[in-house]
Amino acid sequence: VKGVTMLLEEILKQEQERFIKENLLSDEMLELLKENIMPFNTLMAYYRCAIMEVETKFKVLNEEFSLQYDRNPIESIKSRIKSMDGIFKKAKKKNIPITMEGIEEGIRDIAGVRVICSFPEDIYMLADCLLKQDDVVLVERKDYIKNPKPSGYRSLHLIIEIPIFLQNEKKMMKVEVQLRTIAMDFWASVEH
């Protein structure tokens, strides 16, 4: 029984490797992944820290508006880190080198924060408040509210750089911030 179990485990492992090779990654990508797994995990941890920084900034703004104006402009805050598979697919599509530097420089939406607002005017007010903070750097702005996509998609996208403070250094990390209303978020989920 023990031998059969070991044989089944080995077959399962081989099938998993075959599936990965055939469906997700080439041998070259698999080797790069094995060589870079620790730096990649570290980079993903940095992105998670950057998300926490951005979420905190929006929570503070929401609290401030609650105290000053007796209302909350933010309905919800959602965040995500792009999956490893998503990162590799985007890198391949955009001809970005599969290196830590290539990924960090070439893919700007690895970390994402979506802020759902009650009203359209809240979107611009929150974006302005965020961008006025002296540790936030605007890298790119795409206004799909004023210029909707042909599909009807509407949202304000900001690529920002924000510092994370590590044990011995400060590191600037890119985060994509999407601001939209509840109605725009519903449309985006239907459209996607």
Language-model features: where?
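Long beta-strand-rich cores associated with HINT superfamily self-processing modules
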Residues: 104, 117-192
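An acidic, glycine-/histidine-flanked metal-binding catalytic module
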Residues: 7-51, 58-64, 176-192
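A glycine-rich, hydrophobic loop/mini-helix early in the fold
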Residues: 64-110
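Solvent-exposed alpha-helical segments within well-ordered globular domains of core cellular machineries
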Residues: 52, 56, 85, 89, ...
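Phosphate-end processing signature that detects enzymes handling 5′-triphosphorylated RNA
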Residues: 11-14, 97-101, 148-150
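Terminal, regulation- and interaction-focused segments at domain boundaries
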Residues: 110-117
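Short, Lys/Arg-enriched N-terminal segments with co-localized hydrophobic residues
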Residues: 1-5
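Glycine-rich, low-complexity intrinsically disordered segments
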Residues: 20-24, 42-46, 73-77, 103-104, ...
